[in-house]
Amino acid sequence: KVSTEAGAAPGIYTISVTQLAQAQSLRTDSPTIIASTKDALGDESSDTRTIKITQDGRKEPLEIKLNKDQTSLDEISKAINDADSGISASIVKVKDGNYQLVLTASEGLANKMTISVEGDSKLNDLLAYDSKTNTGNMKELVNAQNAQLNVNGIDIERSSNKITDAPQ
């Protein structure tokens, strides 16, 4: 859908959208079925652990500290959502006794996620993912990409599907 707002540059434009921006989405892909959203998934011998999510568009990695009692899908999802970082976490019930964690970033290539967990090898085994090599223990459901369009013969690329500055 193409629309204009008050103050838009007057003119006649030929617009061709070749690619819509997408937000990367990852899900847990553990060979072990996660049977409950309340079961502890972390190493019980570790008191604290830190989930680190690195994105090219973020100056510093997002660090989410979890205590021993915060390693269930419910608690991990809550902690990520409470960080209010542009990354959302949800839990999907695949079927009775089988749950997965899904993480979704904001639109655009700069928001691709690389995830690691420090201080808890069990959680790292569940959540680790490298977006540069597309390897790890999460599975990519949706690949991040920027919007690409052509306006009057000019190729334009933006991280979002809302383009407010071309033409001006």
PLM features per residue range, with description:
Residues 1-100, 104-168:
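Bacterial flagellar/type III secretion structural subunits and associated motility module proteins
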